């Protein structure tokens, strides 16, 4: 059968030499011939060359015949009947709520398997994706601001807000707990609030920072030492120094080494609760500087009095001081200038406080610089 006798004389010529009209369906006689040759077992490529019809047209006609049993073409022009009915949209919403990670092609298979749609009115994968993106896009992005506000409201004055509480719509997202810096997975972290934490940590005193950390001690890891009454008492002292108590009447007494180590360990545990917190690092160095200045003042006052035998900063025992019982542990002349950073670091190492090398160097520099 010659396709030219079935088609009008106007049109275009395809690569096989057949005439076709762009945008118009193939004649019904040609479509029937394609189906008859396919029933005889002829391959689609041979049908295409024999009838001089493009291979895509032959494959499309045969696929529609195998699916629907019809050789008639679809509607010319116009729009397809609406497949995204409210029933289909609601069912897609239910599937998405039950399984948020479901794919569009899985939703299409569920629509067919459960009888919601048939092959004629089932929405395509692109249509289902458009429904998920436009109509149901708000399902995966709903978040409650109460979770962030709950962590911020529990801190009694320890939270920082970038807008000062004027805008209620963004105050929940701007409130961030300072203690959450010590726990990387404890709460949401906003990088654009980093300058607020630095200014707040520099302006806050060591007492407020550690009182706030004591209220949220459960947020820190279990490897750090818990807070004790001795650490809380040492934080309330004016200089925050773990210096041993002086004897009555200005008479100096040599404390027990275990007492020095326990008090220093308690104070260091209170000043260094976390290795990840910016505010704790700043407060620690501020407390070390204050402690060193106060201890230097105590050492100078002891020289003017009855002669205290307690050094401002604990040093390693000297062999000369070990032989003479009444001799002071450290020479009072230029006591602050002759303090060795190495001995100060070794004291903390012997006391059981495992600091890194650069921490000990910074603490010794802050102590000897004053």
UniProtKB/Swiss-Prot annotation:
Composition-biased stretches (Low complexity): 160-182
UniProt DNA-binding region: 9-135
Domain of life: Eukaryota
Name assigned to this protein: Paired box pox-meso protein
Region annotated RED subdomain, chain positions: 87-135
UniProt-annotated stretches for the region Disordered: 139-212, 236-257
GO molecular function terms noted in the UniProt entry: DNA-binding transcription factor activity, RNA polymerase II-specific; RNA polymerase II cis-regulatory region sequence-specific DNA binding
Keyword Glycoprotein listed: no
Source organism of the structure: Drosophila melanogaster (Fruit fly)
Pfam families referenced in this protein's UniProt entry, alphabetically: PAX
UniProt biased composition (Basic residues): 189-198
Record lineage: Eukaryota, Metazoa, Ecdysozoa, Arthropoda, Hexapoda
Tissue-specificity statement: Expressed in somatic mesoderm.
Keyword line: Developmental protein, DNA-binding, Nucleus, Paired box, Transcription, Transcription regulation
The keyword DNA-binding appears for this protein: yes
One annotated GO biological process: dendrite morphogenesis
PROSITE patterns: PAIRED_1, PAIRED_2
Region (PAI subdomain): 12-68
Subcellular location as annotated: Nucleus
GO CC term, one of those recorded: nucleus
SMART domains: PAX
InterPro entries xref list: Homeodomain-like_sf, PAIRED_DNA-bd_dom, Paired_dom, PAX_fam, WH-like_DNA-bd_sf
């Amino acid at each position: 059968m010659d396709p030219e006798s079935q088609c009008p004389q106007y049109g275009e010529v395809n690569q096989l030499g057949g005439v076709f009209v762009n945008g118009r369906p193939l004649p019904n006689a040609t479509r029937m011939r394609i189906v008859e040759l396919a029933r005889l077992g002829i391959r689609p490529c041979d049908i295409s060359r024999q009838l001089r019809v493009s291979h895509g047209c032959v494959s499309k006609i045969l696929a529609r015949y195998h699916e629907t049993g019809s050789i008639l073409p679809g509607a010319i022009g116009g729009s397809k009947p609406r497949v995204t009915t409210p029933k289909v949209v609601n069912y897609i919403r239910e599937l998405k709520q039950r399984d948020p990670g479901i794919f569009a092609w899985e939703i299409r298979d569920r629509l067919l398997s459960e009888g919601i749609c048939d092959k004629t009115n089932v929405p395509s994968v692109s249509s289902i994706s458009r429904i998920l993106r436009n109509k149901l896009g708000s399902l995966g992005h709903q978040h409650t601001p109460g979770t962030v506000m709950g962590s911020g409201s529990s801190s009694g004055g320890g939270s920082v807000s970038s807008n000062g509480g004027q805008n209620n719509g963004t105050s929940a997202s701007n409130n961030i707990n300072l203690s959450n810096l010590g726990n990387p997975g404890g709460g949401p972290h906003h990088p654009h609030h980093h300058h607020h934490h630095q200014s707040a940590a520099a302006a806050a005193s060591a007492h407020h920072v550690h009182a706030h950390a004591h209220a949220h001690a459960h947020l820190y890891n279990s490897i750090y030492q818990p807070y004790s009454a001795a650490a809380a008492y040492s934080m309330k002292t004016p200089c925050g120094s773990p210096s041993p108590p002086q004897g009555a009447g200005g008479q100096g007494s040599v404390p027990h080494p275990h007492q020095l180590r326990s008090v220093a360990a308690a104070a260091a545990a209170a000043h260094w609760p976390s290795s990840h917190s910016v505010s704790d690092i700043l407060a620690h160095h501020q407390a070390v500087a204050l402690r060193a200045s106060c201890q230097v003042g105590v050492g100078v006052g002891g020289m003017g009095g009855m002669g205290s035998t307690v050094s401002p900063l604990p040093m390693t025992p000297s062999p000369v001081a070990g032989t003479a019982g009444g001799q002071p542990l450290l020479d009072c002349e230029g006591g602050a200038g002759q303090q060795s950073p190495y001995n100060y670091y070794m004291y903390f190492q012997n006391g059981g406080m495992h600091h890194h090398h650069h921490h000990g160097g910074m603490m010794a520099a802050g102590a000897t610089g004053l």
